[in-house]
Amino acid sequence: MRKNSGSESLIVRSGSSGMRWVMISFAFVATVLNYLHRLSFTYLTANGYLRGIIPDDTFGYIASAFFIAYMISNAFSGFVIDKLGTRIGYSLSMAFWTTAGILHALALTPFQFGFFRFMLGIGEAGNWPSAIKLISEWFPSNERSTASGIFNSGASVGAVVAPPLIAWLGTTYGWQLTFVVIGVLGYLWLAIFWFTYYTPKKVIKEAKARIIPPLKLLKNRFVSGLTLSKIFMDPVWYFITFWIGRYLADVYGWNLAKIGWFAMLPFIVADFGNILGGLFTQWIIKKGVPIPKARKIAVGIFGLTMALPLLLGPFVINGPIGALIVLAIAGFGYTAYSANTMAFPADVVPKSATASVWGIASVGAGLGGVIFQSISGVAIKNLSTNFDYEIAYSAVFIGYGFMALIGLSILLFLTGPVVRDKELQEYVDQD
């Protein structure tokens, strides 16, 4: 333990102290681009030509195709990134999902969109293991929640930028060119990152340590519990980001231009969660609360902040502004919660396995996305047919609120203490 602590303190004391903020900015921008690609399809199909060929249930199935790929890719992307290193692994992920995003411009049928969404999911899954590994290389333990919040705020910023940008591009230049323009931005990031990023010398040796097999990692109680919790927790955020455009169109009759300006509001609020979630944990750590306990206190508070608005919101929403406020509070809770859960892997496993652990855990997120995106699409179509869209979405809101409580309970009560696994550390230290 002393050895690890001393190694981490070198990150702060060395000349790389300032450079680490440059490096985390790469992860932030990559996450923004990740969400621009992810949400472009969501808003372009909210109404207009693409809405005509992609109804609610088909949209749910196409979203599930993305998450099937996301789940499959997460099963191995973390191990590939741990093996290849952050620079090569992150670059390959960006190149793959950017190319898949551009190819959307060639799609003409729901099946073709589903195929390209599947390919997008394969590439996008690599963003989070890459960023988690980057943080473990550049930031000490007490700052990882804050660093995680900074890079993960890219998801909220991307979700903020996406509605007006995609609405403007889509209405001005058409949906095909929209996919192409976003892709060009990804290639620009790739070129700059490739010639800038490097791994600090002090962690190169550890980064080249033995790769821990996935089954060995899953035997760790915290890793398996984190994976299980993400099956229920992450799909709540996916619902907010994937369905907000259709929700505003279906329930309130908004067009793409209006959606573009108002759909970003919940994500502006959620963006504060990324930063404040990490800063809150850092603050109570400075007050003397042990790091593991501080993280669990934070996830408990912010997990409830996520669940309760969805459970109670349908009973108080009386218009689109009220709906946006409910989604904003829930989104804030999720991002603050995530800023802390992303810091857990480096507290439990060796740095050489952080990407692998997050990849494994994200398999759970992908599995939840596959299951609950399909269920959402079918439920909304059937309930809106038999009743109306307001009742349909209210039922789905409540369902996701209960899911958030389940995911939170698993993380708090089934994962055990957050302590470094000595057996795994000994495994990577073997010659």
Region roles according to the model:
Residues 116-155:
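Cytoplasmic helix-loop-helix junction between adjacent transmembrane helices
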Residues 95-108, 300-318:
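C-terminal ends and interior cores of transmembrane alpha-helices
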Residues 72-111:
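Conserved MFS/SLC helix-loop-helix module at the cytosolic interface between two early adjacent transmembrane helices
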Residues 22-56, 240-245:
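Extracytoplasmic
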Residues 41-43, 221-277, 338-342, 372-373, ...:
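Extracytoplasmic gate region of multi-pass secondary transporters
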Residues 7-16, 200-227, 251-254, 431:
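Juxtamembrane intracellular "pre-TM" segments in multi-pass secondary transporters
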Residues 151-197:
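Helix-loop-helix hairpin linking two adjacent transmembrane segments in secondary transporters
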Residues 53, 85, 106-112, 140, ...:
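Helix-breaking motifs and short loop linkers at transmembrane-helix boundaries and internal kinks
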